[in-house]
A protein has these predicted regions:
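Extracytoplasmic beta-rich repeat domains
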Residues: 1, 23-46, 71-95, 119-135, ...
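A generic tandem-repeat structural signature
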Residues: 1-28
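WD40 beta-propeller blade core
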Residues: 14, 59, 110, 148, ...
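Short loop/turn segments that connect beta-strands within beta-propeller blades
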Residues: 17-21, 62-66, 113-116, 151-154, ...
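Loop/turn-rich, solvent-exposed surfaces of beta-rich toroidal or solenoidal domains
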Residues: 137-152, 156-199
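C-terminal closing repeat unit and adjoining cap/tail of repeat-based domains
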Residues: 186-235
Length: 236
């Protein structure tokens, strides 16, 4: 039977029968007092499901019985302020060719071997959006409004593009919250809470253009067929 996996706000992963809704098993992570709004969906491959919690825990579980294969923690030991101490993994873990890529809010991005749980590389990068893996590169949006291109095998930074922090940069007014990126037709696309979408070259990081939206965008766009869909904050 098929399975549906869901993560609750109190850091539990539940496996349900897709036909009957019967609970098959659950896994409990560490409780966390403070977390960001929203949660990461689990990612599955090769009979395993990788789940992420607001505590910074990243756990690989067997699909059939929920047995833990390995666990890691993406919380940062260097906590500069109260906000940076939130270790939440809100971006969905990505599994590509047997490697798990994940990023936490507190400043740790990792590549982990799915089978063994061993870290392949680690970088001090903080983010709350899902990384996008394409070929030999990974694209990620940071909490500092930067788009980074990293090499898939070593995590080496190839280029960095700074996005605007504020609508009014001179007076630091009206902060912009970005979401994405999504790669489509040789373009990286990000959406902003100020009602603009930006396209960026995946090869150089060069800003290619902007597209007005009906309103702000809070969730990443999706690609279906040859069409890119946005959902704006005014439900258009």
């Amino acid at each position: 039977a098929g399975r549906v996996f869901a993560v609750t706000i109190d850091n539990q992963t539940h496996a349900l029968d897709s036909e009957t809704g019967e609970k098959l098993w659950f896994h409990a992570g560490l409780a966390e007092v403070a977390s960001l709004l929203g949660a990461a969906s689990p990612a599955g491959q090769a009979g395993n499901v990788v789940t992420a919690y607001s505590s910074g825990e990243l756990v690989a579980l067997r699909v059939e019985n929920g047995r833990a294969l390995w666990a890691d923690n993406l919380s940062n030991v260097r906590r500069i302020d109260a906000l940076s101490s939130i270790a939440d993994i809100r971006g969905k873990p990505v599994i590509d060719r047997g490697v798990v890529y994940a990023i936490s809010h507190s400043g740790r991005m990792v590549a982990i071997d799915l089978r063994s749980g061993g870290r392949i590389w680690e970088r001090p990068i903080a983010g709350v959006e899902t990384p996008w893996v394409a070929g030999d590169f990974i694209y990620v949006l940071t909490v500092d409004s930067q788009i980074l291109c990293l090499t898939r095998d070593s995590g080496r930074v190839r280029w960095v593009t700074q996005l605007p922090h504020f609508v009014n940069e001179e007076k630091n007014k009206y902060p912009i919250i970005w979401t994405g990126p999504v790669l489509v037709s040789d373009r990286l696309v990000v959406g902003g809470s100020h009602g603009l979408a930006m396209t960026i070259s995946p090869y150089t990081g060069e800003l290619l253009g902007m597209q007005p939206m009906p309103a702000g965008v809070s969730i990443p766009p999706i690609v279906a067929g040859e069409t890119l869909y946005f959902l704006s904050d005014n439900a258009r």
